[in-house]
């Protein structure tokens, strides 16, 4: 790997169309006015969030004078960002937040440049790849040290081309508290074995974590998850239309859960919920539409479960 210096030169490629394009997030620009010089196709420009890019490929060079401590919103809604190879030279060792770093980068397909990033001090990964709708695999993240991560919410929300999450297999998420909407809308994701040994014991918010994962049919990898600290399970598996068997959740400790609204709503393949009878939901307050539009379930089955739960 090339040596990372105090001053970094980062080359990026954007695909322009002779119109005003957003290439950086406003918050990132405001915070780095004095730290970054910008060159577009070789010409120095003022650092702002929008530019009129010529039709075709445009070269954007960033000259970063000092180590960045906050990459939040750096490429927020940069829909024409095509190539980030230059980011492999970016020194991230001081960074604590990657919130919405690539949010809405819908043309981004390759994140190999990030594989050697030092993320050991990052606590906030919220929405980092949200809306990266062309991203199909994240193997490049397999060696990331995310042990200090606390917020993983919305991290891959809307990554509708994502089919392979093996890069997350060895992640240490033991400090993670927020996992809400982490994979929401990953409609092609069918294999979540990479999550089998995740330590989510510190997690309290699982709302909509797998919402609209319409290809997900096997949740056995979640069988041994310790969700005892979880209080919000609202919509966690809502619209998982291929999910027929929730037996793996039989021994989940949800005794601290207070929100179960829409948890399995529109799971149109779901046929059996008897295994949930062992759940302790004594602290639950919201159960509205928990199984709404589960067309293969009978009302009598749902009523029987609720009677067992005494709600």
PLM feature spans:
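Negatively charged
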Residues: 1-311
């Amino acid at each position: 790997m090339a040596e990372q210096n105090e001053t970094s030169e980062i080359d990026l490629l954007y695909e322009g169309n002779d119109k005003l394009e957003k290439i950086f997030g406003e918050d990132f620009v405001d915070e780095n006015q004095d730290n970054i010089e910008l060159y577009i196709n070789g010409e120095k420009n003022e650092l702002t969030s929008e530019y009129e890019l010529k039709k075709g490929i445009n070269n954007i060079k960033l000259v970063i004078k000092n180590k960045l401590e906050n990459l939040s919103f750096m490429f927020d809604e940069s829909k024409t960002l095509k190539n980030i190879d230059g980011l492999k030279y970016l020194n991230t060792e001081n960074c604590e937040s990657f919130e919405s770093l690539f949010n809405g980068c819908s043309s981004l397909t390759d994140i190999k440049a990030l594989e050697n990033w030092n993320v050991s001090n990052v606590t906030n990964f919220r929405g980092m790849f949200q809306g990266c709708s062309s991203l199909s695999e994240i193997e490049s993240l397999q060696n990331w040290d995310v042990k200090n991560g606390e917020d993983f919410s919305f991290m891959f929300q809307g990554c509708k081309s994502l089919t392979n999450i093996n890069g997350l297999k060895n992640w240490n998420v033991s400090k993670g508290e927020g996992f809400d909407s982490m994979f929401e809308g990953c409609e092609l994701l069918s294999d979540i074995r990479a999550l089998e040994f995740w330590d989510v014991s510190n997690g309290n918010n699982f709302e909509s974590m797998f919402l609209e994962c319409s290809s997900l049919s096997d949740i056995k990898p979640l069988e041994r998850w310790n969700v005892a600290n979880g209080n919000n399970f609202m919509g966690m598996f809502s619209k998982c239309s291929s999910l027929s068997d929730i037996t793996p959740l039989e021994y989940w400790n949800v005794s601290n859960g207070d929100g179960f609204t829409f948890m399995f709503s529109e799971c149109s393949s779901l046929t059996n919920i008897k295994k949930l009878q062992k759940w302790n939901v004594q602290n639950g307050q919201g159960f509205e539409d928990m199984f709404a539009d589960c067309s293969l379930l009978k009302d009598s089955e749902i009523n029987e479960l609720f009677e067992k739960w005494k709600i």
